[in-house]
């Protein structure tokens, strides 16, 4: 039976067989040093929008409203252009609005104040909603932002808010505005303020250890669009498969810092680390339960790679599976009642589901020759994404649990694997080699709008914060 290893090693793929990185990490097989203040704090809103502003802007019948986001009016530097571009990108990401391209605004007069907004010119351009914003810098470290969303037809204000705080958080203000507009106009939880964590070799370092010339990989985090990437670990060892805690304040991952795989948790605001498995056996691929109190992971502590569940602090350990095969890559259902995972008990890796109590095991994928690395969607979607062998490569597929059907969302552009859902379930992050190196991409759940997130080095196994 393939992949039957009693101890994870950093060997290369068997001749003639290319094994997806996620399953390879499971049978091969982060931590530490996150500085205090690694993540920027959210900007402060200057009070809630007036209660009478509840206008929802619509487009022509059967079409989304057309939005325009020109540069904010700024008293210094490129702050206004940055806010305008980032906000446009954020609103465009969710596809709830048709975003009128910014390069078509050249003929529109620039408004220096809200009472100068040229509604007639915007209407002639076919715009339904326009953002007007200003940004001031009262001192070197502070910005003050005002933003209004106008209904171009009625000239009424549909959204208005003020923000103030650190000038270093300029992009975060734009993300916040986008999420609040999506919430107010579409009752949609946007993802502009969310973050991705991933493993990367971008530091290009090498170390000698139990496995010679092993590539160093560290854990990184970045904004959902790839901006503001920063390093979480500095162990100069192999650190892989990071996952977020539900409160987005901690990252659990697998680290080879001791020469074998073990589970660590980086507390990213405190700059501290935890090691809940405490070096007992070899442990890898942790994942938090939806309430954050438990961790499911793979361990060979009893001689074979099996799934275990423990409390976050390492107490309450119990074994979930008991099979001679390899059971790995767990993912929790949104209600915490079930766990999907990869097992090669049928001869090739396939996706299975088991109750969180270890009962009611069933095989999910039956039409795939090879299926790996499941990830369970958040509500209201009821589906599991996974990587599947397709011809000579690997692509992302989605299994609809209600309908019992599978759809494919990537199609032969390199190797595509390690999917991870956004917290609103509308997007997936994944690893792809379509550009010639391993990079993180995002894609809508219907397979449209693939976007490259990382470019520096090689990047692997993304996870999306709440």
Protein language model annotation of sequence segments:
Residues 49-118, 131-137:
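Short beta-strand->alpha-helix linker/helix-N-cap micro-motif
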Residues 189, 200-218, 234-238, 254-264, ...:
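A flexible loop/linker signature enriched in serine peptidases of the S9 family
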């Amino acid at each position: 039976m393939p992949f039957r290893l009693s101890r994870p090693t950093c060997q290369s793929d068997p001749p003639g067989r290319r094994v997806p990185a996620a399953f390879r990490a499971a049978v091969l097989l982060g931590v530490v040093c996150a500085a205090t203040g690694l993540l920027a704090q959210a900007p402060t809103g200057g009070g809630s929008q007036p209660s009478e502003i509840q206008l929802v802007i619509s487009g022509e019948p059967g079409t989304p409203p057309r939005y325009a986001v020109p540069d904010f009016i700024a008293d210094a530097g490129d702050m206004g252009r940055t806010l305008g571009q980032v906000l446009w990108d954020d609103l465009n990401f969710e596809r709830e609005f048709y975003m009128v391209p910014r390069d078509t605004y050249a003929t529109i007069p620039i408004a220096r104040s809200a009472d100068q907004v040229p509604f007639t010119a915007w209407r002639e351009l076919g715009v339904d909603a326009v953002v007007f914003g200003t940004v001031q810098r009262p001192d070197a470290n502070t910005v003050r932002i005002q933003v209004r969303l106008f209904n171009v037809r009625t000239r009424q204000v549909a959204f208005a808010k003020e923000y103030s705080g650190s000038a270093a958080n300029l992009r975060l203000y734009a993300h916040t505005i986008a999420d609040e507009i999506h919430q107010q106009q579409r009752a949609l939880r946007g993802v502009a303020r969310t973050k991705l964590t991933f493993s990367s070799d971008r530091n290009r370092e090498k170390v000698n250890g139990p496995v010679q010339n092993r590539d160093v990989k560290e854990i990184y985090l970045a904004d959902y669009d790839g901006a503001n990437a920063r390093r979480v670990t500095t162990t100069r060892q192999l650190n892989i498969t990071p996952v977020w805690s539900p409160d987005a304040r901690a990252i659990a991952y697998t680290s080879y810092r001791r020469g074998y795989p073990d589970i660590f948790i980086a507390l990213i605001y405190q700059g501290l680390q935890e090691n809940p498995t405490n070096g007992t056996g070899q442990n890898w691929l942790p994942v938090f339960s939806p309430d954050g109190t438990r961790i499911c992971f793979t361990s060979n502590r009893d001689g074979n790679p099996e799934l275990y569940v423990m409390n976050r602090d390492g107490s309450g350990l119990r074994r979930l599976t008991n099979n001679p095969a390899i059971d790995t890559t767990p993912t929790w259902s949104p209600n915490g009642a079930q766990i999907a995972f990869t097992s090669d008990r049928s001869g090739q890796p396939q996706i299975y589901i088991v109750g969180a109590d270890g009962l009611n095991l069933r095989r999910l994928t039956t039409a795939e020759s090879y299926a790996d690395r499941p990830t369970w969607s958040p509500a209201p979607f009821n589906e599991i994404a996974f990587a599947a062998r397709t011809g000579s490569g690997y692509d992302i597929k989605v299994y609809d649990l209600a309908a019992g059907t599978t759809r494919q969302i990537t199609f032969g552009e390199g190797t595509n694997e390690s999917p991870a859902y956004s917290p609103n379930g509308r997007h997936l992050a994944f690893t792809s080699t379509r550009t010639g190196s391993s990079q993180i991409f995002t894609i809508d759940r219907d397979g449209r709008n693939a976007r490259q997130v990382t470019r520096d080095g090689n990047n692997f196994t993304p996870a999306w914060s709440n």
